[in-house]
């Protein structure tokens, strides 16, 4: 029996499968929080207050990008789950490839913008000049790995759309612990400071993305699209944006509020 068939939620009773599907989602959100928490705790303890301020002031900016990606991936997963339930595998493959191509393009553009504009953005929210060099270094490194953040969210939401919410959680937990050990190694042992903390986060996210990709290739033949990975469907992209924009903006508005408050406090 294939992995997909084992997680088919269109058959049988719904309550227990629904609870079993939901719990890993909740746990995954909790472990997602450990990334920035680990960075803040370890940097604050072993580097100093200014380094902690650099991480703290960068967090809302980083979260805006992550939440935009997460929201759009959620929109895509709604469509993918509907297509999978209807056994419309041709549309499903086009949905997957379209989301992947659009998300990678968005991630690259967003990363390049932040590499160029990190300092002006930090000044716009009135981050103290003394904290800008470290905050800008942290942001640039984090955004260089934004494509890994997208790919994990994309692959994880694709597996969830097909009924498997446990496997993405296992990879996320592994990545979260590796991030903690990476922080300790790069910050405490190598003494790379804020940059080391960002490198640890990017490396752990890259590994999480790699593990998802390997698992999908071995266990979920339906998602091994081959040349179909390069199919781009504008109409499906429009539907994805329509479904995902509400969720993305709802979450981003909270971070924008934090940025406004932060800029007022920094005045």
Residue ranges and their predicted role:
Residues 20-39, 141, 175, 204-208, ...:
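Transmembrane helical elements of multi-pass membrane transporters/channels
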Residues 103, 158-184, 195, 199-202:
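Alpha-helical transmembrane segments of multi-pass membrane transporters/permeases
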Residues 43-63, 130-134, 194-195, 236-243, ...:
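Interfacial/gating helices of multi-pass transporter permease domains
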Residues 64-67, 179-184, 209-213, 259:
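Hydrophobic transmembrane alpha-helices of multi-pass small-molecule transporters
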Residues 26, 30, 64, 68, ...:
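Residue-level signature of the transmembrane alpha-helical core
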Residues 30, 34-53, 122-129, 185-192, ...:
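Helix-terminus/linker motif at the lipid-water interface of multi-pass membrane proteins
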Residues 1-22, 80-145, 189-245:
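Short alpha-helical transmembrane segments in multi-pass integral membrane proteins
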Residues 52-112, 149-168, 258, 262-266:
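Small-residue-rich hydrophobic transmembrane alpha-helices
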């Amino acid at each position: 029996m294939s992995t997909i068939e084992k997680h088919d939620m269109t058959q049988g009773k719904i309550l227990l499968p629904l609870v079993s599907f939901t719990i890993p989602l909740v746990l995954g959100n909790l472990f997602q929080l450990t990334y920035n928490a680990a960075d803040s705790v370890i940097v604050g303890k072993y580097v100093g207050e200014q380094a902690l301020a650099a991480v703290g002031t960068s967090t809302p900016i980083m979260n805006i990008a992550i939440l935009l990606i997460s929201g759009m991936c959620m929109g895509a997963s709604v469509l993918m789950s509907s297509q999978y339930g209807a056994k419309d595998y041709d549309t499903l493959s086009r949905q997957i490839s379209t989301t992947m191509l659009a998300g990678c393009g968005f991630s690259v553009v967003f990363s390049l913008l932040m590499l160029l504009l990190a300092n002006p953005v930090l000044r716009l929210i009135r981050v103290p000049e003394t904290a800008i060099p470290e905050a800008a270094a942290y942001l640039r490194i984090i955004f260089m790995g934004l494509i890994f953040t997208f790919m994990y969210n994309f692959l994880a939401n694709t597996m969830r759309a097909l009924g498997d919410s446990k496997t993405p959680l296992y990879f996320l937990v592994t990545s979260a612990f590796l991030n903690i050990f990476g922080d300790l190694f790069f910050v405490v042992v190598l003494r790379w400071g804020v940059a080391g903390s960002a490198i640890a986060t990017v490396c752990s996210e890259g590994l999480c993305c790699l593990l998802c990709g390997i698992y999908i290739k071995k266990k979920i033949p339906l998602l091994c699209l081959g040349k179909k990975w390069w199919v781009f469907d504008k109409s499906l992209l429009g539907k994805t944006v329509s479904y995902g924009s509400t969720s993305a903006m709802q979450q981003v508005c909270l971070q924008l509020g934090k940025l406004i408050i932060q800029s007022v406090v920094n005045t």
